[in-house]
């Protein structure tokens, strides 16, 4: 499977017990939603490899998983801290104005005055709204290295064009 078709949705953590269970860190909105997206791929030595989920459960407010063929602590330790990915085709279509974070990362952000503010390097979730983390251009006229711009569709974010990878915002370049 080619890497550009895989989206990271979580990470395996440390081992749990002696029978091959691992802790898991989900980056989906609801932690257990990670199990809605199958099959999983693990990034092992830079390559995505398919893996089958055998079982999962909550243990002391953490999620632990059992992967098929991982039957002891030693086998599980090899997979500790490995990223979990899924093929992008398993994600449902979104409504107008809704976007997956992976679609926004890498977009160029331009304000209404036409000033290129930088490139979206990551997204952050806050209590009220998502935030674009924008790495400023190296010769930013305002001396900025990074900008945090709220992803408030229509209020701040005026247009998203995924074809040209451009996000137009109503945001002062000095902020």
From Swiss-Prot:
Subcellular localization(s) per the UniProt record: Cytoplasm
GO BP term (any one): rRNA processing
Pfam families linked to this entry: PRC_RimM, RimM
Alphabetically ordered keywords of this record: Chaperone, Cytoplasm, Ribosome biogenesis, rRNA processing
Sequence ranges assigned to domain PRC barrel in this UniProt record: 96-175
GO CC aspect terms: cytoplasm; ribosome
Keyword Manganese among UniProt keywords: no
Main location: cytoplasm
Molecular function terms, GO-annotated: ribosome binding
NCBIfam families reported for this sequence: 16S_RimM
Role of this protein: An accessory protein needed during the final step in the assembly of 30S ribosomal subunit, possibly for assembly of the head region. Essential for efficient processing of 16S rRNA. May be needed both before and after RbfA during the maturation of 16S rRNA. It has affinity for free ribosomal 30S subunits but not for 70S ribosomes.
Complex and partners: Binds ribosomal protein uS19.
Family membership noted in the UniProt record: Belongs to the RimM family.
HAMAP family documented for this protein: Ribosome_mat_RimM
Domain remarks: The PRC barrel domain binds ribosomal protein uS19.
Name listed for the protein in its UniProt record: Ribosome maturation factor RimM
Organism: Haemophilus influenzae (strain PittEE)
Gene: rimM
């Amino acid at each position: 499977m080619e890497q550009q078709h895989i989206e990271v949705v979580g990470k395996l953590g440390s081992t749990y017990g002696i029978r091959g269970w691992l802790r898991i860190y989900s980056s989906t909105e609801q932690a257990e939603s990670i199990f809605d997206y199958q099959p999983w791929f693990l990034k092992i030595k830079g390559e995505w490899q398919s893996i089958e989920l055998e079982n999962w459960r909550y243990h002391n407010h953490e999620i632990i998983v059992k992967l098929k063929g991982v039957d002891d602590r030693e086998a599980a330790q090899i997979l500790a801290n490995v990223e979990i990915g899924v093929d992008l085709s398993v994600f449902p279509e979104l409504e107008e104005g809704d976007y997956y974070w992976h679609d926004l990362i890498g977009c160029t952000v331009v304000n209404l005055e036409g000033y290129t503010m930088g490139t979206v390097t990551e997204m952050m979730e806050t209590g009220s709204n998502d935030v674009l983390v924008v790495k400023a251009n190296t010769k930013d006229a305002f001396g900025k290295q990074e900008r945090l711009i709220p992803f408030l569709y229509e209020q701040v974010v005026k247009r998203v064009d995924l074809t040209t990878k451009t996000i137009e915002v109503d945001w002062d370049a000095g902020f």
